[in-house]
Amino acid sequence: MEKFVELKKVTDRMFQEKKIEQHPLFVALNNGEFSEEQRKEMALQIYHVVLYFPRFLSAILTNMSDYRMRMPLVENLFEEHGKMNEKYVHSETYKEFLKGIGVSEKEIMESEPSIPVIAYNRGLTDLCLHYHYLEGLAALGVIEEIVARVSPLVGQIAKSNYGSENKSLIHFTDHEVLDVQHANEIYEVVALNYEGDQKQMIERGLQFGMYYHSRMYTDILENVH
């Protein structure tokens, strides 16, 4: 518990300094600076990240030899897959959100990930698969926390712009709660090894998570302008 508290102080400080909720993408969205087509394109690009996220978890699990440390991640992966209910698979709930803001099934099917999103997906896969699991795991913890922090903002903006009913916003209402839980579960696993030389590796992983995800938001913003 002591190491977890110490690690949480590091992540809390990081989020105080970076203030991801004030990223220019969310400021511009909140200020209504985008056309409907631009909003839809940004939402579609995030879809390609949501679609890919379970593969990051799968990649990192291959590098973890201790089943006890794998268990929280397996549960996370189980929830990503809707606890085996296809209706609640996270990529499917996100598709419901897309439809709620006026994106058609045809537009979803024809959408392609942009170069920034491909770079993000490949970069994180590489980190999770080919480097020490503590580094990748720390990055995923930060990413889960970022999503938990921005989900209420996105949900509120969607309600304001589209009057979306709660049903189509389930992806974001779920992630407000689930991703806080997932982030803390990941931090708890990482904290078990937060000592000695591994501290530096873990802190580098935290920074990677913040860098990759905030950079992805920046690149998506630049792409639609």
Listing of model-derived features with the role each one plays in the protein:
Residues M1-H225:
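Non-heme di-metal
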